[in-house]
A protein has these predicted regions:
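P-loop NTPase nucleotide-binding core
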Residues: 1-92
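Amphipathic alpha-helical protein-protein interaction segments
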Residues: 17, 67-74, 125-132, 220-224
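Sensor-1/coupling segment of RecA-like P-loop NTPase cores
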Residues: 100-101, 112-115, 121-206
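C-terminal alpha-helical "lid" subdomain
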Residues: 101, 105, 177-182, 206-283
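Eukaryotic short linear interaction motifs
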Residues: 3-8, 114-116, 164-166, 230
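Alpha-helical repeat scaffolds in large eukaryotic proteins
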Residues: 83-86, 90, 112, 116-119, ...
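Short basic/glycine-enriched coil/helix segment immediately N-terminal to the Walker B
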Residues: 90-103
Length: 283
């Protein structure tokens, strides 16, 4: 999104999409680091003619590592790995070592940054929309496909009120999702609509829209900060553990609650884990 990694157009893609080889290679590296034992236990079960260097006896760890050494093939490696992880049956001739694939957790933070134009430029020096980056397009497409995780799993996509480009279309799309969950139909006058003459991005508006007469599997959960009472109980945990050497009173809790952006638990935790050390002067 920030325009800091290499990118290139994918030949033959329509509409034109762009791949980010270095970023894809980095994701493959983190995927292996976090799931090495699992990936090493699963054998390749599909045919990947675009990866001629891949041996039929390879594990999924071996497959992912192909994208480490050569970022030029990292996108094809990622696509092959995704095909393997979502496979429900082996390809002909590869039945011997096939094992059922586990459920997957796909987590995306800062979703709002994917709803605007990126810092990348096309050959005509026009801004490239984030949805035209193959990486982004892949993960957003999972929200539209009811069987995107064929072996089960969870899509957890998050955005926040801070560090947010505040795209109008995403706000409307989320309001519409909340309205549908509340039982408000799209034909109701209460159903959220873009302001008149607004330039809300239609691609973003359609992102969370279910197919006609279909029930969307996407669910909206709104999370807020802790109340002052909840924050006090949370901070008392650190005080009783000995990590926090402070007198927990209403004034102190109120101050830290405000400094944490209204009880954001991650910010409160920073205060709780902050160890105060005192040094005595030597005589």
């Amino acid at each position: 999104m920030s325009g800091e990694t290499a990118y290139a157009a994918i030949e033959g893609s329509n509409p034109l999409q762009y791949v980010q080889p270095t970023a894809t290679s980095a994701l493959l590296t983190r995927t292996v680091d976090a799931n090495r034992e699992l990936l090493a236990s699963l054998k390749v079960s599909q045919k990947h003619p675009a990866l001629k260097m891949l041996k039929p006896s390879s594990t999924l760890e071996d497959l992912a590592k192909l994208g480490f050494s050569d970022p030029a093939v990292s996108w094809r490696v990622f696509q092959a790995l995704w095909t393997e992880l979502t496979a429900t049956a082996p390809a002909a001739g590869l039945e011997k070592d096939f094992q059922p694939r586990p459920p997957m957790l796909v987590a995306v933070d800062g979703l709002a940054h994917w709803m605007t134009e990126s810092a990348y430029r096309s050959a005509e020096f026009k801004p490239i929309h984030a949805h035209d980056l193959a990486f982004v397009h892949h993960f957003l497409s999972l929200l539209k496909e009811s069987d995107s995780l064929k072996n089960g799993g969870l899509l957890l996509y998050a955005t926040s009120a801070s560090n947010n480009p505040n795209p109008k279309a995403l706000n409307i799309a989320l309001d519409r999702l909340a309205a549908r969950q509340a039982g408000i139909s799209a034909s109701s006058p209460e159903y959220p609509q873009p302001p008149a003459y607004s330039d809300a991005d239609p691609r973003v508006l359609d992102l969370l829209q279910p197919a006609e007469k279909a029930v969307s599997p996407v669910e909206l959960q709104t999370l807020g900060g802790l109340t002052r009472e909840e924050a006090r109980g949370f901070m008392e945990y650190f005080a009783r553990s000995g990590l926090l050497r402070e007198i927990i009173n209403d004034q102190w809790v109120s101050e830290k609650w405000s400094l944490s952006g209204g009880g954001i638990i991650g910010e409160l935790e920073k205060f709780g884990r902050r160890v105060r050390a005192t040094a005595s002067a030597s005589k």
